[in-house]
């Protein structure tokens, strides 16, 4: 299947009305994208350990609420 696997639990997603943010609490660098409840996925973002970054629109955006963070395929 084309469905990407969920990001590990040590990558935490925070949502607000404006942004969806990911925090990497893992020991390794991870590349994640937001999977929205409507089936859309956002662009991939690479987070080194300890990084916190905006990974997509918040719940007032085009795709509504994020569902989870998904791992991006390794290039």
UniProtKB/Swiss-Prot annotation:
UniProt keyword terms in alphabetical order: Alpha-amylase inhibitor, Disulfide bond
GO molecular function: alpha-amylase inhibitor activity
Pfam families the UniProt entry points to: A_amylase_inhib (PF01356)
Segments traversing the membrane: none
Position of the signal peptide: none
Cystines in this chain: 10-26, 44-72
InterPro entries, alphabetized: A-amylase_inhib (IPR000833), A-amylase_inhib_sf (IPR036379)
Function: Inhibits mammalian alpha-amylases specifically but has no action on plant and microbial alpha-amylases.
The protein's name in its UniProt record: Alpha-amylase inhibitor Paim-2
Species name: Streptomyces olivaceoviridis
